[in-house]
Amino acid sequence: MTWETARRAIDLAATGKMPFTLQFSGGEPLLALPLLRQMADYVRSNRIPARMDLQTNGTLLTEETATFLRSARIGIGVSLDGRPAVHDALRCYPDGRGTAADVVAGIRQLAQCGMEIGLTTVVTADNVAELSGVVEMAYYLGNVRRVGFDLLRPQGRGSAVRRARAEDMAQAMEAVFALNRKLGRMIGHSMAITQMEQAACLAQRTGSGFSHCHAMNGAGVHVDALGNIYACSSFVGDAHFLLGNVERGIDVQRRKEVALEMQNAMAFCRTCADFSACGGACYARRAGQGPPAVSAAECALKRAAMKALLNVAVQCNKRTGQ
């Protein structure tokens, strides 16, 4: 991405004069560190009301980079798919070496700068049985404030990877929440689990709808390296989901049409008794993959989070005598 494209993307997002989130993702965004510096400086010097977040594979987190990220107040999410052996089997350098050691070293660089982070785990059939290891790693590292689990989306290289089964997902998340409670009692506070936080937010809402997805609500877009604007990062290169570009802006009517198309395709979610507490499944994860059954693992993930939240509420009520 050129600086001119990046600047136009920021300016376009800022036209509404309302706070927004600027998410740097990839590929690997730290490969474009000079551009990130320019963008962060531009946001700060122009007092643009943007929260900046970055999702990284963690292998390029040097002391210099960590210092910059802290000074720019950029929130950090690091991809970690399990304990080192599990992660190395899934994420390797071109020469076959695993990346786990460099990821852990990068996270420690952030810790030395006083930065807390979130961990994101992409769940597949190859690591679903080992998800509790991510929780162990989060406590071990010491500067992790949140762990999130993201089921594989079958686009691009992901189309060749085996997806986790619903029954395995349910069992894995039960183990995750149990271990989190156990370790939390030992040190005095539990790790935040993204799916449980989402369930807590949804439990407080008064309306209904596909609240989890910015694309389905017309509330977020993805800008690619060429400045093209898509409804979701999962559909980069697919002209059907092209909404405009940073020069011409967003086709508002097309954005509405795409959002409605996504909602209609996921209409089966509305018939579920858990819909209001779930927010619906991910359109991108299901698109082109057949019947609603392909969302079963996601349903299992969310139901496990709702169950864990209910258990917390029950325990709180017992302690307060309600």
For every predicted segment, state its role.
Residues 93-101, 108-212, 216:
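Radical SAM enzyme [4Fe-4S]-AdoMet core and its adjacent flexible, acidic
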Residues 226-228, 241, 264-322:
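Radical SAM enzyme core and accessory elements
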Residues 3-25, 32-152:
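Radical SAM/AdoMet-radical enzyme domain recognition
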Residues 84-88, 156-159, 281:
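Short acidic/His/Gly/Ser-rich catalytic and metal-binding motifs that mark active-site loops
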Residues 168-203, 229, 233-279:
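C-terminal accessory region of radical SAM enzymes
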Residues 29, 59-60, 83, 124-125, ...:
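Short, solvent-exposed loop/turn segments at secondary-structure junctions
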